[in-house]
């Protein structure tokens, strides 16, 4: 029976076709072989402005990690979320209700073929809208930083 390859061995066996991303250079191919989650910097830097507490932020990041296709919203089970988060089911449910009330997400209950309740589908269009609304503020702040940098580098220009 062949021996399973480790993440490191698989990553090293992959032919070098492209230059490694900065993320891959930081974390290495073994870590990156398990994938990554795209988290917009506006979400990270704007957490306070968005009114997100740490638990809510972490829940959103977990949901983002399940969102692979823009046309297919994530639908992790509460059990899967709880395996990743250090909180009780009651606390998770409260934070999800709060995120829904704040307009970050919308839940849609799935049902199985037998008519039983399945996991929720989490529509994150509210989060996307809120981040797009914040983008101009971040553009302005970037322009101000650039102007200050230019002034420092060329004070008499």
Where on the chain are the PLM-derived regions?
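Generic structural signal for residues positioned in beta-strands
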Residues: 58, 121-123, 157
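Short recognition helix of helix-turn-helix/winged-helix DNA-binding domains
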Residues: 1-84, 90-91
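Charged low-complexity intrinsically disordered patches
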Residues: 1-30, 126-157
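Winged-helix/helix-turn-helix nucleic-acid-interaction surface
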Residues: 90-148
């Amino acid at each position: 029976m062949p021996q399973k390859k480790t993440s490191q061995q698989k990553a090293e066996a992959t032919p070098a076709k492209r230059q490694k991303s900065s993320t891959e250079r930081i974390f290495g191919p073994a870590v990156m072989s398990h994938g990554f989650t795209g988290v917009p910097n506006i979400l990270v830097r704007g957490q306070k402005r968005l009114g997100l507490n740490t638990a809510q932020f972490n829940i959103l990041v977990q949901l983002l990690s399940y969102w692979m296709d823009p046309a297919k919203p994530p639908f992790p089970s509460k059990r899967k979320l709880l395996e990743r988060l250090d909180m009780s089911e009651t606390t998770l449910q409260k934070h999800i209700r709060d995120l829904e009330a704040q307009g970050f997400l919308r839940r849609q209950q799935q049902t199985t073929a037998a008519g039983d309740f399945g996991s929720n589908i989490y529509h994150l269009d509210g989060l996307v809208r809120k981040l797009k609304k914040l983008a101009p503020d971040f553009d302005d702040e970037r322009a101000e930083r650039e102007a200050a940098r230019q002034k420092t580098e060329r004070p008499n220009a």
